[in-house]
């Protein structure tokens, strides 16, 4: 019988480095563990937290990166930047466990909403979110400012 995962916030460069291979499954553009640790430090300075689901040996099985925010649309809310479970652990309940953990953090932090974005190319993630009580409320639009800067410079 499998033991339930241990949920722990990762706060040090060593812990972030250990979590890098899991995050890279979600964010393949991330190049290396050292750069990832530096990125985590910068994001932590902007109130980002990284929560890990770990097995009894301490191996990272999944991650939820989030931050508490406030805006005129949602009031105080918890925004999930990153939610990933290793390919081998998907459909094991770890993703739902991570979502429950951040939902509890949102409740304790007096948030009115839990918010996240997912790509239109990720139908399995969308189905997971629907099954776990999240509803699609809008679309996310992006414009690369790097492209605009390059075109303006030419």
Identify the meaning behind each predicted range:
Residues 86, 119:
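Residue-level recognition of the GNAT/N-acetyltransferase active site
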Residues 2-75, 99-101, 144-146:
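Acetyl-CoA-dependent GNAT
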Residues 106-118:
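Conserved GNAT acetyl-CoA-binding A-motif
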Residues 69-80, 90, 136-137:
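A conserved beta-turn-beta hairpin within the catalytic core of GNAT-like acetyltransferases
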Residues 2-3, 104-107, 134-135, 139-154:
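Terminal substrate-recognition subdomain of acyl/acetyltransferases
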Residues 49, 112, 135:
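Short acidic/polar active-site loop segments enriched in Thr and Asp
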Residues 85, 91-104, 131:
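Conserved acetyl-CoA-binding loop-helix of GNAT-fold acetyltransferases
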Residues 96, 108, 120-139, 143:
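Conserved active-site alpha-helix within GNAT-family acetyltransferase domains
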């Amino acid at each position: 019988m499998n033991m339930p995962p241990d949920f722990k916030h990762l706060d040090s460069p060593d812990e972030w480095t250990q979590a890098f291979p899991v995050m890279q499954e979600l964010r393949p553009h991330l190049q290396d563990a050292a750069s990832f640790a530096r990125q985590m430090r910068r994001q932590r300075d902007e109130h980002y937290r990284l929560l890990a689901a770990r097995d009894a040996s301490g191996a990272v099985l999944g991650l939820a990166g989030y931050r508490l925010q406030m805006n005129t649309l949602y009031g105080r809310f918890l925004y999930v930047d990153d939610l990933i479970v290793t390919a081998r652990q998907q459909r094991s309940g770890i993703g739902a466990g991570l979502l429950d953990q951040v939902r509890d953090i949102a409740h304790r932090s007096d948030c009115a909403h839990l918010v996240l974005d997912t790509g239109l190319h990720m139908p399995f993630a969308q189905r997971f979110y629907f099954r776990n009580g999240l509803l699609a409320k809008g679309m996310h639009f992006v414009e690369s400012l790097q492209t605009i800067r390059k075109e303006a410079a030419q």
